[in-house]
Every structure is written in C-alpha cells, then in structure tokens.
Amino acid sequence: MAQGSGSAERALVLGVVLVFLVFNCEVAESVVYTVGDGGGWTFGTSGWPAGKTFRAGDVLVFKYNPAVHNVVSVPAGGYKSCTASPGSRVFKSGDDRITLSRGTNYFICSVPGHCQGGLKIAVTAA
C-alpha cells in the first residue's frame, strides 16, 4: 500500500506543477496591425509606427488601392534612396499581410514619386 500512496503523491505534485505552469507561462501571440489604421497605406503614414511596440512574428496588413500603390520590402539603403533593388519582394494585392522579422523592417511604395512623397515606413521589431 505504501507504494501506491507514493504514486498518488507524485501524480498530485505533477498536477500542481502543471496547473502552476499553465497559469504562469507567458504565451507569445503575434499581433496584427493595419498600417495607417483606418486610412490604410497612403501618403502620411510614415509616422504611423511611432509609439507602437512591435515583435518579430507580428503581422502588418497593408490595405490600399492596387491600381494606385504597392508595397515593397527593401533593405535600409533602398528605404533611404527610395529604390527597390532587383530581388526586392513586391506586394500588389491591396490587402497584403507581411510578418515582421526581428530588427528593422523597411517598406516603400515603388510607384514613381510615392516614396519620395513620404509613402514609406520603417518598423523595428524586438
């Protein structure tokens, strides 16, 4: 009987530990952000990331008229010069979902004059 009692105690301790873990573990969930909020991806959104905390795995949704704009993921140099290099990923659906990588993620509109007019954002994800 003593042996059965030890098994019950171990099961109880294991149950308590599992309950503790369930209630004290932090679950990392990605957050979905719509770039530009209600206005979408358009001129004047370059300051949109300010004050927000982004994490790797969060998703940016770019909503825009695909007949007018696009979204291009570029490196820092392309962001500064408003140039999409060959091999840059171009999105043009008007409802694009892009998952953030750790570090700074740069996006521009490659329609002539749009990036130069301020249609670009830099988003840093921890």
UniProtKB/Swiss-Prot annotation:
Residues 1-30 form the signal peptide. One of its GO terms (cellular component) is plasma membrane. Strongly expressed in stigma and style and to a lesser extent in leaves, ovary and petals. Not detected in pollen tubes, mature anthers or roots. GO terms for molecular function: electron transfer activity; metal ion binding. Gene3D superfamilies: Cupredoxins - blue copper proteins. InterPro entries: Cupredoxin (IPR008972), Phytocyanin-like (IPR039391), Phytocyanin_dom (IPR003245), Plantacyanin (IPR041844). Pfam families: Cu_bind_like. Keywords: Copper, Disulfide bond, Metal-binding, Signal. Disulfide bonds join C82-C115. Cu cation binds at H69, C109, H114. The keyword Signal applies. Induction: Activity enhanced in the presence of stigma/stylar Cys-rich adhesin (SCA). Diffusible chemotropic factor that induces pollen tube chemotropism. This is Chemocyanin. It comes from Lilium longiflorum (Trumpet lily). The lineage of its organism: Eukaryota, Viridiplantae, Streptophyta, Embryophyta, Tracheophyta.
